[in-house]
């Protein structure tokens, strides 16, 4: 039995997902990623989907076919869809919900339901932010992915701000005729790293 802990996270501008697989002998594998503007629920689904794709891909070359997987999630949205078989109703209704509207996150649900049909796959509900070690680790993967992307974006913004300030100074100097055209062009190229 392989246990995989998944989590999704979202801020105003960034979203992240992460999963942590724990082998019976204690070895661990993990993955995380980000998206822009996705909801927390979508990231919960993405974490589970990416984990199951990994499990299936690795399962053919690392474990015998008797290895089952349990996805541990703090998402009621994901767990209830599997446990209460919402997905069966959606499939039978042309991927429309009980209000006859298209199912939210349908693209991800369609992939996830292929795993729901696999008897080796099960889901377990865990309480979020309750101190469960592996669930907390999955949460840190999801939130850490967002933080890493935001830090990278801030570094790029800081660099761009410095370039913009330098270019403004160069153009101001040019407008005040402090430097000739050819010297101004050299300074612009240097500022831009050209």
Please give the residue ranges for each predicted region.
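Short intrinsically disordered terminal tails
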Residues: 1, 190-194
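RNase H-like nuclease fold core
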Residues: 1-42, 46, 53-56, 82, ...
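Residues that form generic nucleotide/phosphate-binding pockets
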Residues: 111, 115, 141, 145, ...
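A two-mode feature
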Residues: 126-127, 138, 142-164
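Charged/polar low-complexity intrinsically disordered segments, enriched in acidic residues
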Residues: 155-190
């Amino acid at each position: 039995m392989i246990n995989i802990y998944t989590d999704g996270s979202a801020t105003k501008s960034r979203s992240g997902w992460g999963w942590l697989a724990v082998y019976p002998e204690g070895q661990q594998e993990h993955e995380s990623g980000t998206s822009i503007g996705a909801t927390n629920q979508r990231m919960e689904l993405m974490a589970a989907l990416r984990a199951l794709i990994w499990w299936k891909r690795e399962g053919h070359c690392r474990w015998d076919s008797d290895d089952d997987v349990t996805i541990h999630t703090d998402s009621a949205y994901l767990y209830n869809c599997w446990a209460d078989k919402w997905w069966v109703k959606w499939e039978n209704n042309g991927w429309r919900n009980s209000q006859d509207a298209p199912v939210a996150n349908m693209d991800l649900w369609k992939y996830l339901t292929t795993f729901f049909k696999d008897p080796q796959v099960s889901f377990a509900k865990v309480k979020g932010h309750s101190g469960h070690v592996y669930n907390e680790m999955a949460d840190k993967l999801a939130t850490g992915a967002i933080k890493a992307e935001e830090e990278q974006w801030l570094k790029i913004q800081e660099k761009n701000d410095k370039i913009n300030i330098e270019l403004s100074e160069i153009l101001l100097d040019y407008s005040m005729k402090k430097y000739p055209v050819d010297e101004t062009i050299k300074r612009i190229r240097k500022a831009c790293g050209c």
